[in-house]
Amino acid sequence: NLLEEETKMKKNSLQELGWALGVMLLPVLYAVWVYETLPENLSIHFDLSGKGNAFLPKFLVVSAFPIVMMLLEVMIYWTTIAKDILNRTFKHLIRWIFPFTFVSLYLATIYRGLNEEFDIRKTAAMVVALVFIIVGNYLPKKVQADRELINRKWAYLFVLLGFITFIVSIFYL
């Protein structure tokens, strides 16, 4: 019975991985659709003023970059299967935060290639703020069998930094 339950959990994990990879493919379809209108080189890194300071050919951004990100997602899934995570909600959060972060930042990168006036800093800051808030929410909880609880003050600090970053990104960027 324990073997059946473990097999079912792995099957569910593989289905969830398939959904996550599918979500990660959606912005790639958009990038393929607008491929001809993209500039030859796309910014993949930006300085604090929002200007691109590292570039890749659009072919690599549209094709190779998503493949690398999907491989990282597979590694995240493998890690959450191999390592015993006690909190199921946290396990799903770890599995889905990367695809949604990728989708947000990838779409922002593609849109920035189409519109130089688009301020990518706002999108990046909002994603970082949400990650801080989520991590702060789960820091004080015991999520792995072999780990100790982390002091709640760190969790409060992460949540506070997340809210401040989010407010700054909305009103000041």
Show the residue positions of the predicted features:
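Feature 926 captures the class I aminoacyl-tRNA synthetase adenylation module centered on the KMSKS loop
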Residues: 10-42, 47-49, 55-173
